[in-house]
Amino acid sequence: DIRKKYIKFLGYEFKMVRGKSRRGYISRTIPDRDRLKRKVDQIAEEIKNIPKCYSREQLIGEINRINSKVRGIIQYNQCCTWVSVAMDKHGRRLQLLAMRRLKQYKGKWIPANQTQNLPHIHQQYKQKIPSVKYRDIYVGFTALTFCRWEQTRYKNQAETPYTEDGRQAYFQRTKKKRINARLDEMYPDKTARA
């Protein structure tokens, strides 16, 4: 009974809880807590294993690699309604680990909107993140708490590759060029005709 106990499916936990809907229940989704903890532990180990003798360029590369893993976890789980609640439990731990590792490199707590990496994400937040100075810019570890719930779209049954209307609907939703248009641009005219 999903009104009493969570069910696990594809890395998410799903439950129906009492709410203000017409039928009395609303759905609550949360990232699978065990799986999320394993992923965060893996990232924490990678932060701990950053060598103390790295050059600045190597350190920046390592920060970017770890940031991409954090963003991947966030993007996979942002369709959950309780994503921010789940991420808050682990976010502070990663930030403190990162700051402890950056002390050897004279790291500081800098507001996220003043760092230069991941600008489309960090510009929305004023929370301080552990950062290191490289030349005259700051590069920081992104926070696991920089996530928001995004409602997923329902499947549009008319969107099919077999009809012109379906292809047009897909193009409008994704704003992508069609495959044959891409191939025409990739090859020169002589090759395309042959």
Would you name each region that the model predicts?
Residues D1-A194:
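Non-catalytic terminal/accessory segments
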